[in-house]
Amino acid sequence: GNENEYQPTFADRAILTYRGENIDSLSTHLFDETTVPVSFDFPGTGNGGVIPGFHEGLSEFRGASGYTDNGDGTYNYNDDYGIGAVFIPSGLGYFSTSPSGSGINPYDPLIFTFQLYRGIQMDHDGDGIPSYLEDLDGDKILFEQDDDFDGDGVPNYLDPDDDGDGVPTADEIEVNDA
């Protein structure tokens, strides 16, 4: 497939528009939306990123097959981009710690509708290993001690020297293009 059609993983970046609503009793309330495409780094580079339920849902979709750079910082995407909705239980959303001032109550389920224009495979530390492959225990959480091979307090996906030997990982790996 075309690289523009990349299907993002939990460790990647996406360019999208979205609408987020929380479900409170029998009605929904808008808490966030954008009509202009924005870029989300799913894991973030600190305690951030997007909620697990959102990146899990987005990872089932592909971006457009192509786009045109308008030269002014905007893009026109082919009309075959991913369109979807994700219904997120509170345990995969904000659970009991809703963002202050968001209007989201603790334990509210969420609904996101979105248009996924582009998925971008990330290598956050530039070591030649895609970030999703640096999740050593396979649990889709990159900030854990289990994902810090050399125990230096920096998770592998942000550590350009994963094994702590003083030699950058990019200089140690061998890529087979077979």
Task: Indicate where each model-derived feature is located.
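A beta-strand/beta-hairpin structural motif
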Residues: 22-108, 112, 126
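Short consensus segments that form the blades of beta-propeller domains
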Residues: 5-10, 101-106, 144-148
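Residue-level detector of short, conserved catalytic/binding motifs and their immediate flanks
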Residues: 12-16, 112, 156
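A short beta-strand signature
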Residues: 10-24
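Start-of-domain signal
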Residues: 1-13, 122
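Extracellular calcium-associated, cysteine-rich motifs in secreted modular proteins
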Residues: 118-178
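Extracytoplasmic/secreted envelope proteins and their assembly/folding machinery
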Residues: 15, 51, 55-58, 130, ...
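Residue-level recognition of well-ordered beta-strand positions that form the cores
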Residues: 17-21, 113-115, 172
